[in-house]
Amino acid sequence: MKILTKLWTNLINKITNKKYLAAVSGGPDSMAMLNMYKRNISVVCHVNYHKRESADRDQEIVVDFCKKNNLPIEILDVDEKVYEKYAHIDNFQAKARLIRYDFFKEIGKKYNIQHLYIAHNFDDFLETAYMQRARQSKALFYGIKESNVVNGMIVKRPVLFICKQTLQRYCDENKIKYGIDETNELDIYERNRVRKTISNWSLNEVYDFKKAVLKYNKEHSSFANFVELSYIEFKKNKYRYDYFVRQDDGVQYYLIYYFLIDQKISNPNENKIISLIKFFGKQINKEKAYRVQENLYIHVNEDDLISLISYDKNDVIDDPNIIEKQAGN
């Protein structure tokens, strides 16, 4: 449709002159985004995990587009050496996310670019919000933000409120090649099951759900802003324990959560965070540390800073998650 093409043109005209990296998988979402915003994209980033039969096909699609449009491209071939570096992360989705964002950061430094385009769409927004609500997550924001900072990069999601079907139709109408990820149909992944559930909703159900999510986000926005400022201060002070302990439990929860994320501890769960709040009681014992990952523990060091420390063998005490720190550590 010509009207649809005009819509994309109008969107592009509103963009600033900033230059971006673009994360492009080869699927319809990222290929549509790549074509819409190619004037603002300095470098395309593609990650090949070599975990599905169509992986090389998708890489070829992205490479061909970049050649035709004179766009520089950086490719990460994830081999066993790369996977070994992230072997401490059991969940593949969490591992893959960390691998690609570390890659984006590396390429950003290489080209001196701090902004990154990601092609999350409205379907992704709904699926994420659905899973968060189903888990009764304590997240202060349901869904996916249009812009945030990830691994030191400013991430923009320019097609977030465009549905996947519309993006695929855009590719078809503009004769842009794309690949379909065959694993999207596998029920072994929670997101795929959620996707099938939402696909059966009526337009009214989608509207009502979106309305409820936006209401939740608005109601929590003030506290979310306060937490964000508190964490900035916490980080600025090198994670001082005395700053942490002065906050109430609600703020402490998110200070720990963001600290663990910054330290690349994948998917810290609610029970772990609540246990850490109890561990960091007002009478903290500096001789003890709490396990947050295999052989990796959190503690208060001699400078009264909350930090991580590694151990291979330790004496487990009352709680199997807690160890007595060895002399000299």
Which residue ranges define each predicted feature?
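ATP-dependent adenylation/nucleotidyltransferase module used to activate substrates
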Residues: 1-131, 165-166, 173
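AMP-forming adenylation/ATP pyrophosphatase catalytic core
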Residues: 3-18, 148-150, 217-329
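Proline- and acidic/polar-enriched loop/turn elements at helix boundaries
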Residues: 35, 47, 78, 160, ...
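Glycine-rich loops and low-complexity Gly/Arg-rich segments
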Residues: 67-72, 98-102, 140-145, 203-206, ...
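Flexible helical/loop "lid" subdomain adjacent to adenine-nucleotide binding pockets
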Residues: 119, 123-265
